[in-house]
From Swiss-Prot:
Subunit (UniProt): Part of the 50S ribosomal subunit.
Protein name: Large ribosomal subunit protein uL16
GO biological process, one term: translation
Gene Ontology, cellular component aspect: cytosolic large ribosomal subunit
Family: Belongs to the universal ribosomal protein uL16 family.
Amino acid sequence: MLMPKRVKHRKQFRGSMAGKATRGNKITNGEYGIVALEPCWIKANQIEAARVAMTRYIKRGGKVWIKIFPEKPVTHKPMGVRMGKGKGALEYWVAVVKPGRVLFEISGVPEDVAKEALRLATHKLPCKCKVVSRADLEGGESNEN
């Protein structure tokens, strides 16, 4: 599971997901990618499930890049515990994703295989996503509908 090796502060505020992604919104390594269409938190196990779905479909060919990393800790208090008495224990790690962020990239496989692998991966993610090519994003179609 993805998580930071060490962190300065074990517990964080929830923060906000307002606005669009200003960084990580271009395809840099691969030929095709998944772009988020809405803001969400993506858990480490969801990222891993999407990666496994893609790599199993493309078998031995191609290369996959994971462009997000779960660096935000999320805490929960146990069931039936009253309010107060401090913040809850660390439960899991999430990657904060804004609209327009490229989540995964893939290359080295034919177009139909790449698009199907990315489509399978989008079903493992909690937010609406679309499959795009490098030409789509460079051609000015980066704005969402």
